[in-house]
């Protein structure tokens, strides 16, 4: 029905040990908003096994992606998925590049710690899974479900994944009420009729 100025492209890095709900909820919400979403494995295989032993296939491998056309990159949490993301050269390269270019960098649960380690949270407001606050180097921490500070979006965990996905859509569509309302109605989001 609607057309967003220039199709927005979102990538989500998937690592073995990721929290599947945090990752796949964002994929679902972004696709419901009719934005282009690509699931990206950080290993040499498309198959990813989550922290709760759910195995799924990604769209592509990080080594095969041209990230130039992307508008946002997302990091789901989970353990040891977050550690795997943090240890990935390509993840660190892309999040730093996107942050410097003003593109959206979004992380949930433990994954904001990867942003902290990369120096991307200095002086920024951010949130994370309880117990990871010390790893948000330089951040002004919050207990809010989702925190948007410029082009950095952070969230607390599986229970906030829908709000996290909606925040990503809101930022990418410049808070287009028609798009966001369509998604909220489609997922029977709380108070969607008021939105």
Regions inferred by a protein language model and the residue ranges of each:
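Short, Lys/Arg-enriched N-terminal segments with co-localized hydrophobic residues
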Residues: 1-6
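Active-site-adjacent pocket-lining segments in enzyme domains
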Residues: 9-12, 18, 33-41, 59-195
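N-terminal beta-loop-helix "entrance" segment that forms/cooperates
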Residues: 40-59
């Amino acid at each position: 029905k609607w057309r967003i100025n220039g199709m927005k492209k979102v990538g989500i890095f998937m690592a073995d040990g990721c929290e599947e709900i945090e990752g796949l909820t964002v994929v679902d919400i972004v696709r419901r908003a009719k934005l282009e979403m690509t699931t990206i494995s950080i290993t040499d295989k498309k198959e990813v096994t989550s922290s709760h032993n759910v195995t799924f296939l990604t769209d592509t491998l990080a080594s095969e992606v041209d990230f130039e056309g992307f508008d946002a990159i997302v990091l789901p949490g989970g353990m040891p998925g977050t550690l795997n993301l943090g240890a990935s050269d390509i993840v660190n390269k892309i999040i730093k590049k996107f942050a410097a270019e003003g593109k959206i960098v979004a992380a949930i649960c433990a994954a904001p710690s990867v942003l902290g380690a990369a120096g991307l949270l200095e002086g920024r407001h951010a949130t994370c899974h309880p117990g990871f606050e010390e790893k948000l180097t330089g951040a002004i921490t919050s207990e809010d479900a989702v925190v948007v500070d410029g082009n950095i979006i952070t969230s607390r965990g599986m229970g906030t994944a829908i709000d996290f996905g909606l925040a990503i859509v809101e930022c990418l569509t410049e808070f287009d009420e028609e798009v966001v309302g369509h998604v909220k109605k489609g997922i029977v989001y709380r108070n969607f009729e008021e939105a």
